[in-house]
Amino acid sequence: MDKAWKQRERQVAKYFGGQRTPLSGGNGKISRADVIHDTLFVECKLRKKHTAITLWDETNEMAKKEKKTPVIALCEKGRPGFWVMVHSDDLDKI
């Protein structure tokens, strides 16, 4: 049976229409990404807890009360632009 992180990498690869990189990203001969894809460089991180996901959980609770889709914009001082965090189940809603 695969380890949990390998299963997650396969799940993410399938979602994006790619394939899990054998031997994991760092050791891969094709790409250093965790997922082999024509245009995306996908890195997967399976952790017990992610700070950004804790923030998403809090935002999701507030969004549910207003019947809205939660979206988080992560910004860093001194860096232009922002990163968008949306749950994979919600991507088709935005």
Which residues does each PLM region occupy?
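Catalytic phosphate/metal-binding cores of nucleic-acid and nucleotide-processing enzymes, i.e., regions
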Residues: 1-94
